Amino acid sequence: MKTGLKRVKLHVKKNDMVVVLSGNDRGKSGKVLRVYPVKNRVIIEGVNIRKRHMRPTQSNPQGSIIEREFPIHASNVKKS
């Protein structure tokens, strides 16, 4: 673990339904998929979707671009 980072107890847990309070996805709601207490961030289903470029591998020789959820700060969400 990096120095200077402290685990914080968050107000949301996995599988909670939350609403986004600020940012580009403001007003959207979804289920919490994952919680990162050390970074104070959460991943919410269907919120903060970004494109990720995947390298070519033996199973996928062409590579691909997939869309997935990225974490947002826990202070930007509230339970619904």
Swiss-Prot record:
The gene name on file is rplX
SUPFAM superfamilies documented for this protein: Translation proteins SH3-like domain (SSF50104)
Pfam families, A to Z? KOW, ribosomal_L24
Q: Where is this region: Disordered?
A: 53-80
Enumerate the transmembrane spans.
none
Keywords on record: Ribonucleoprotein, Ribosomal protein, RNA-binding, rRNA-binding
Output a single Gene Ontology CC term carried by this record.
ribonucleoprotein complex
Species per Swiss-Prot/TrEMBL record = Chlorobium luteolum (strain DSM 273 / BCRC 81028 / 2530) (Pelodictyon luteolum)
Annotated protein name in UniProt: Large ribosomal subunit protein uL24
The record's family statement is: Belongs to the universal ribosomal protein uL24 family.
